[in-house]
């Protein structure tokens, strides 16, 4: 498992490397180029379930120490980890379906108690102090 310090620094270095490639590109304003070096936000999603990373709290603390906001997206399947998650800038729960059967079909969950886990995570949102968001997935019934 990679340590959070290495992940944060690696992500920042990769970001800087990409921004440097824009130097001298026609249409890129110098002030915008410089602004690109000041990372302000980090979205933790689309790379698996971020709250399953054992060092997620340290990772987000490192971001916050650097003045970087943290946007974390969870699939609402890990209520115990959600209880121990320290505040992030904004916490999203993906709502991929509105019924147990639809959620099973859409997400193909690994745990038999997926619906109970899902509803438990939703209930926990009411106890959290940071901004929270339901991220809805809309689609036709199949």
For each predicted feature, which ranges?
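Local cysteine-cluster metal-coordination motifs and their immediate loop/turn environment
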Residues: 1
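Conserved AdoMet/S-adenosylmethionine-binding subsite of the radical SAM
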Residues: 8-142
